[in-house]
């Protein structure tokens, strides 16, 4: 039973790592962001006037 739980935990962590590293999930700092349909990667935010992801 412990082995099954451990395998499920490892599978869940692996799936989370793959989903977190998806390059199409968010826009990098400096990317055009208005009317793209994707959010800027944290901690950047979309500046509507500059049409760019800006931030720290």
From Swiss-Prot:
Expressed by the venom secretory cell of the spine. The spine is a cuticular structure containing a single large nucleated venom-secreting cell at its base. It is an independent unit capable of producing, storing and injecting venom. On the back of D.vulnerans caterpillars, spines are grouped together by 50 to 100 to form scoli, of which there are eight in D.vulnerans. It holds the Pfam family Toxin_30. It comes from the Eukaryota. SUPFAM superfamilies: omega toxin-like (SSF57059). Residues 1-19 form the signal peptide. It is found in: Secreted. Transmembrane segments: none annotated. GO terms for molecular function: calcium channel inhibitor activity; toxin activity. Disulfide bonds join 26-41, 33-46, 40-53. InterPro entries: Assassin_bug_toxin-like (IPR012325). Coiled coil: none annotated. Keywords: Disulfide bond, Knottin, Secreted, Signal, Toxin. GO terms for cellular component: extracellular region. Probable toxin. Shows a moderate antiparasitic activity against the major pathogenic nematode of ruminants (H.contortus, IC(50)=22.1 uM). Does not show insecticidal activities. Does not induce increase in intracellular calcium in mouse DRG neurons, suggesting that it does not induce pain. The presence of a 'disulfide through disulfide knot' structurally defines this protein as a knottin. Belongs to the limacoditoxin-22 family. This is U-limacoditoxin(3)-Dv21.
């Amino acid at each position: 039973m412990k082995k099954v739980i451990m395998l499920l935990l490892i599978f869940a962590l692996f799936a989370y790592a793959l989903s977190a590293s998806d390059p199409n999930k968010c826009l990098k700092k400096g990317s055009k962001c208005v009317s793209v349909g994707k959010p800027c990667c944290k901690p950047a935010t979309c500046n509507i006037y500059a049409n760019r992801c800006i931030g720290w």
